[in-house]
Amino acid sequence: MADEKTEDRRPATLVGAAAATFATNAGTVTFSLLNVLILARALGPTGRGEVAFVIAVWVLTAGLATLGFEEANGNLGGRHPERRASLATNSVVAALALGILGALIVGLLMTLVPRTRGEVDLGLLLFALATLPSGLLGQNLKYLLQSDYRFGVTNLAWFASPAVTAVSNGVLALSGALTVERVVLIFVATNVLATLILVVSVARHFGFGRPDAALARESLSFGLKTHLSKFMALGAYRGDQWLLGAIVGPYELGLYSIAASLAEALFYVSGVIVLVQRPHLVRAVSAQAAEFAARIFRRAVVLSTAVGAALFVAAPTLCVLLFGKSFRGSGDDLRLLALGALGVLALDLFSGVIVAQRRPLLASAGTAVALLVTVIGNIILVPVLGGGGTAVAKSAAFTAGGATMVLIFLRMFDAPPGALIPRLDDVAWYGRKLREGLLAARRAG
């Protein structure tokens, strides 16, 4: 039975939500990297590249097919709790219709233009694409639950997929039975599992109401405004792997994908911040949003800089130590990707701020710049430099896109540039939180 109460569940502070989400993120990253390690050791660069290509195609197609319904759920669900049940049912309808349509379009493209699928088996790609409705539904329901600050269950779903994936692939690898086809099957199955977790939670807390055509039109109207920006951002993040695999094949993609997986530690810093600040920013007036976002950005710069510097120094040794000598070339790619750390942060965080303040079209500027640099850079550099060319293009794209969003944020909120420069207090903030955490742990013990 669905909960009858729809009052605002806003917590007194976002620190707890951020800490829980970041802890889940740390576990997710750990299992994701463990899975990358298993695949690299068991399948080698070429097999790893084939898997990366299938996942890149699936993720990009899902991003294209959403039409922004998940973003609309985040905003409409946050402002109108009484409409969540209808939003849930509309999410199911949209996921089915758009997922099937997206799979048909991309499947037809790859059938008619074989070069777009590189050297990967068409049947394997079509199998993965057939599960798009489940993936879209999971995205829609995740944002709906987060609009009610239900980060616990979305964190569970987020964590379950890579955890089960890593364990399953590990068992198969130890038995010598791991293949590219089985890896893709497990990827699909664990995504369905994550979606089922969210479906159960939505049914319990909101229920599934009657479909609402007027509400669907409102969701589509808002969603389309955010869709271009979000898909371009996804293209900047994942489009390089599709391009690299199609242009030079799975071996180079296998090397690059290892570096990209390790570099995702940079992306998760900004990704977690955007998730936990979204419900607050949706409800905040302009001045509050500007002050809040600037403070969060300064503190995140401190963390992103530290993570980026550590990756740059450790990259060559780290790739060989974890994945073996056959992945030696991944170290140079990782160093190049680490240079884009602050660009990633600025692009993600300020795009999220502007979308939450109901200016989704404006948020597309930075992602448009990033995607343009990504595509042009890959076309020019990949035939000459392989995966290294993709890494250069990606860092340049994030830096250019992030700089664009900084300028837009400062102008939109009339904020001084100095508001974004980290201060000693921002560094000290981490020390204070660490001491508070240790003290709380000591008291609990």
Question: Model-flagged regions — what are they?
Answer:
Residues D3, R10-E70, T131, L224-Y251, ...:
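Signature of the first transmembrane helix
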Residues A65-E82, A263-A287, S351-A356:
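Helix-loop junctions and terminal segments of transmembrane helices
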Residues V15-T28, S32, V54, G63-M110, ...:
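Membrane-water interface segments that mark the loop-to-transmembrane alpha-helix transition
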Residues D121-F127, N155-R204, V369, V373, ...:
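Hydrophobic alpha-helical transmembrane segments
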Residues M1-L14, G152, G176-I186, L196-Y237, ...:
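Interhelical loop/hinge segments that connect adjacent transmembrane helices in multipass membrane
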Residues N75-R79, S134-L156, R283, L339-G366:
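Membrane-interface junctions at transmembrane-helix termini in multi-pass inner-membrane proteins
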Residues G16-S32, T154, W158-T165, V183-V202, ...:
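Transmembrane helical elements of multi-pass membrane transporters/channels
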Residues R10, P45-R48, M110-A128, V313-L342, ...:
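Interfacial segments at transmembrane-helix termini and the short loops linking adjacent helices
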